[in-house]
Each structure stands twice: as structure tokens, then as C-alpha cells.
């Protein structure tokens, strides 16, 4: 599948219901892979935490703000799905932060 040369703006996700809807849509579409990156404030805080999650499919980009989201379990469900490859770049710190902050396990990882 060729990637589009048109890049629509990323969709901002900041509620539990938006997150659940997005994860349900992604899981239902049965993608081969999703790309994930996290941003943390560990350089500027005594105990760092995930401040932003960037998630991309072949057709759309999403910015997930975990602070206002009361329940991140839908994201954990995606991470646990073994049939979907999760693409990270230098995944070590992302995986540490995801485990530390949300207690989620990530399966089927491709680390660039």
C-alpha cells in the first residue's frame, strides 16, 4: 500500500471515549502495523512521566494527551494485540515509560 503524499492534520485525542473509539476503529481495521512514539518530561522533572503519545497508521496520525484521559486501558489493548506490529524508534525508553506509567506490556515490536 502506497503512502499518501497528502498529510491531513493529526487528530487530537484527550478523552477516554475518544481513545476507546480510536482504538476500536484501529483494531477493527486490522492494520499490519502502527507507529508509536512517546514524549516524556524526564529531563525537567524529578520523576518523569509520559506527556504525549504519537500514534500513526498508514492513513492517519494521532496525538494522544494522557493527562486528561481517565482510563488508558484502550491503548493498552492495542499494545497487547500480537497480530499488529508496533513500530518504535529506539524503543528502550518508550517501553520503560509505558510500563512504568501505565503498566502495559507491548507485544510484536519492531524497533528501528
Predicted regions and their residues:
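N-terminal accessory regions of nucleic-acid-interacting proteins
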Residues: 1-34, 38
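Short active-site oxyanion
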Residues: 10, 61, 81-86
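Short, well-ordered alpha-helical microsegments
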Residues: 19, 72, 94-96
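Catalytic-core regions built around general acid/base machinery
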Residues: 22-25, 73-83
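A residue-level signal for conserved active-site and pocket-lining positions in enzyme catalytic cores
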Residues: 37, 53, 87, 111
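Short, glycine/acidic-enriched loop or turn micro-motifs at the edges of active sites
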Residues: 40, 68
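A short alpha/beta connector and helix-capping loop motif
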Residues: 44-60
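Metal-dependent phosphoesterase core characteristic of DEDDh/y 3'-5' exonuclease domains
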Residues: 55-58, 93-112
Amino acid at each position: 500500500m502506497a503512502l499518501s503524499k497528502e498529510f491531513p492534520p493529526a487528530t487530537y485525542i484527550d478523552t477516554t471515549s475518544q481513545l476507546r473509539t480510536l482504538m476500536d476503529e484501529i483494531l477493527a481495521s486490522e492494520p499490519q502495523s502502527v507507529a508509536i512514539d512517546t514524549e516524556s518530561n524526564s529531563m525537567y522533572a524529578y520523576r518523569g512521566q509520559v506527556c504525549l503519545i504519537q500514534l500513526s497508521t498508514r492513513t492517519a496520525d494521532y496525538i494522544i494527551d494522557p493527562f486528561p484521559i481517565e482510563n488508558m486501558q484502550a491503548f493498552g489493548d492495542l499494545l497487547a494485540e500480537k497480530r499488529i506490529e508496533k513500530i518504535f524508534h529506539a524503543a528502550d525508553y518508550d517501553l520503560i515509560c509505558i510500563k512504568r506509567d501505565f503498566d502495559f506490556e507491548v507485544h510484536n515490536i519492531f524497533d528501528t
